[in-house]
């Protein structure tokens, strides 16, 4: 995610440097593209956080299931 922000920062810097050589329409288009990319990065970040939460819940469920199985095995050994 940090790499993406660095790339986006470079795009902003490049568009700023090219502003003297470019028309306003091109600069506005680049700004719009950057805003779109920032929105996509934010959405992907939210998706990753949601997946992380789901993975943690699955790990917790697996640990509880393993504990139940361990308890059943112990009761059979007695």
UniProtKB/Swiss-Prot annotation:
Cross-referenced InterPro entries: Lipoprotein_leucine-zipper_dom, MOM_Lpp
Transmembrane segment boundaries: none
Any single GO BP term: periplasmic space organization
Gene Ontology molecular-function annotations: lipid binding; peptidoglycan binding
Pfam families referenced in this protein's UniProt entry, alphabetically: LPP
Bilayer topology annotation: Lipid-anchor; Peptidoglycan-anchor
Localization in the cell: Cell outer membrane; Secreted, Cell wall
Lipid moiety-binding residues (S-diacylglycerol cysteine): 21
Gene Ontology CC terms: cell outer membrane; extracellular region
Residues modified as N6-murein peptidoglycan lysine: 78
Covalent lipidation (N-palmitoyl cysteine), chain numbering: 21
PROSITE patterns (UniProt xref): PROKAR_LIPOPROTEIN (PS51257)
Signal sequence segment: 1-20
UniProt keyword list: Cell outer membrane, Cell wall, Coiled coil, Lipoprotein, Membrane, Palmitate, Peptidoglycan-anchor, Repeat, Secreted, Signal
Matches recorded under HAMAP family: Lpp
Its job: A highly abundant outer membrane lipoprotein that controls the distance between the inner and outer membranes. The only protein known to be covalently linked to the peptidoglycan network (PGN). Also non-covalently binds the PGN. The link between the cell outer membrane and PGN contributes to maintenance of the structural and functional integrity of the cell envelope, and maintains the correct distance between the PGN and the outer membrane.
Family: Belongs to the Lpp family.
Subunit relationships: Homotrimer.
Protein name stated in the entry: Major outer membrane lipoprotein Lpp
Organism: Photorhabdus laumondii subsp. laumondii (strain DSM 15139 / CIP 105565 / TT01)
Classification of source organism: Bacteria, Pseudomonadati, Pseudomonadota, Gammaproteobacteria, Enterobacterales
